[in-house]
Curated annotation (Swiss-Prot):
Substrate binds at residues 52-54, 95, 204, 255-256. It comes from the Bacteria. Gene3D superfamilies: translation initiation factor eif-2b, domain 1, Translation initiation factor eif-2b, domain 2. Pathway: Amino-acid biosynthesis; L-methionine biosynthesis via salvage pathway; L-methionine from S-methyl-5-thio-alpha-D-ribose 1-phosphate: step 1/6. The keyword Signal does not apply. GO terms for biological process: L-methionine salvage from methylthioadenosine. Catalyzes the interconversion of methylthioribose-1-phosphate (MTR-1-P) into methylthioribulose-1-phosphate (MTRu-1-P). The record marks 165 as: Transition state stabilizer. It catalyses: 5-(methylsulfanyl)-alpha-D-ribose 1-phosphate = 5-(methylsulfanyl)-D-ribulose 1-phosphate. Its EC number is 5.3.1.23. Belongs to the eIF-2B alpha/beta/delta subunits family. MtnA subfamily. This is Methylthioribose-1-phosphate isomerase. It comes from Acaryochloris marina (strain MBIC 11017). PANTHER family: METHYLTHIORIBOSE-1-PHOSPHATE ISOMERASE (PTHR43475:SF1).
Amino acid sequence: MTASVANPVYPVVWRGDHVELIDQTRLPQQFSVVEIRRSEDMATAIKTMIVRGAPAIGVAAAYGMYLGSCEVTTDNRDGFLSELAGVGDTLKATRPTAVNLFWAVDRMLKVARQTLGPISQIQDQLLTTAQEIGADDVRTCKAIGDHGLSVLPKDPEKLCLLTHCNAGALATAGYGTALGVVRSAWTAGRLARVYADETRPRLQGAKLTTWECVQEEIPVTLISDGMAAHCMQQNLIDVVVVGADRIAANGDAANKIGTYSVALCAKAHNLPFYVAAPLSTIDFDLADGGGIPIEERHPSEIYQIGTTDICPKGVEFYNPAFDVTPAELITGIITEHGVFAPGDIREKLSHHRSA
């Protein structure tokens, strides 16, 4: 039996003269969109996580570069390129861990440098490129979903899959990476249930992953982060699939804080642990995960729920947004080009990369 995917979600949409973003800070209580017309506003949207998830940030940043190009007033080519590079620097400073952000900005800068003709022609090409980046990401995610489906355990026929954070349509241009595998498995009749870690402190699993599953009528069970090991011990989980914000050349993978703990639990219970991510998430210039910059966010994410403090005064805080899962804990990395052992990605995938 197969199922269909209903209510597709597209978090970054071009509307003729502005970008519409699904405001992910308001989900699941409220579905609303934010109109972005200036590059500075796009940078703020990325920083405040109105848009989040490495691929979605990349698409948003590409549109931010186009919007920034329209704000440049000079007719001098060198001056235009210099100001556009400044727009890129502002966007890059928003989220240091997500490599797709840097990839998209650099691609837009390269297009601007290589496009001949008047400034208006460069701007037109930048818009076309941003749209291509978004369309390519949807196709990429669907390929990731299909490749992921092909390596899921054959037994049981209908699997229970655990995921951490949100690597779904909301985190990409559409369809998702880890949830792309979920969608493909659901459509193929191979999925019984998703187990979603709540993902403290921002609760992307509780707020966003469950919301996506509910939209498409995919059975989903929410658990707190500390329950993952227990669920594995009780044989409730068959496979783990997560996303990534940056993957080093050796296969070490940075993802939302808590992913490393899930990987250790999966290893202890002999469960396959897959990372699903596009080629643009792999940083071939980074030898290993030790060099991945880890964003630290405001401590209020830890000590407040809503506007209520949950701990006494005098407590100190540490709030890294990501951790790095060592390659040896990863069963395979699912990309649009296939599924690869972490140690093979440099040899088998580096020739695919493009600026």
